[in-house]
């Protein structure tokens, strides 16, 4: 059975790329950043499935250049406002995303910031890295206590 042609617009985690290559005929960008519009226009000409990320603007011009075989845009991320959903649906292209994928990650980062910012962790780290730290003192890098707040 012929494997569907999948265009992946930028590098993903190794395990994801490996699995995709097992299941599909994959054309994988080696870039760690969004590909150019010209590269995207060229890539979609023979795609059956497109796997973009938030940095890839999938507008009407991209969808118009796409192969009639393009049936799925599997967005690698939660947001999808970079994809022209209306035009995709008019062309019979299903658009999916990964809702809630970042919910716990966002909560983790929020907790890290709640602890790091008032306690001046970034400033302390920079002082250590630059070699300017002179040692502990009663008033250095005290920051703000968050207990009870």
Regions found by a protein language model. Give the residues of each.
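An N-terminal-biased, well-structured beta-alpha scaffold segment characteristic
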Residues: 1-96
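Phosphate-binding beta-alpha-beta segment of Rossmann-like dinucleotide-binding domains, i.e.
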Residues: 91, 99-149
């Amino acid at each position: 059975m012929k494997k569907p042609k999948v265009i992946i617009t930028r590098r993903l985690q190794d395990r994801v790329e490996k699995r995709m290559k097992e299941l599909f005929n994959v054309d994988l960008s080696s870039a760690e950043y969004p590909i150019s519009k010209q590269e995207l226009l060229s890539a979609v000409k023979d795609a059956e499935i497109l796997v973009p990320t938030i940095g890839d603007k999938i507008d009407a011009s991209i969808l118009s250049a796409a192969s009639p075989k393009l049936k799925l845009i599997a967005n690698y991320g939660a947001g999808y406002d970079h994809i022209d959903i209306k035009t995709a649906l008019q062309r019979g292209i299903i658009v999916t995303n990964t809702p809630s994928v970042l919910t716990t990650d966002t909560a983790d980062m929020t907790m890290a910031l709640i602890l790091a910012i008032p306690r001046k962790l970034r400033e302390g780290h920079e002082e250590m890295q630059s070699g300017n730290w002179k040692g502990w003192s009663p008033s250095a890098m005290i920051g703000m206590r968050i207990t009870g707040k």
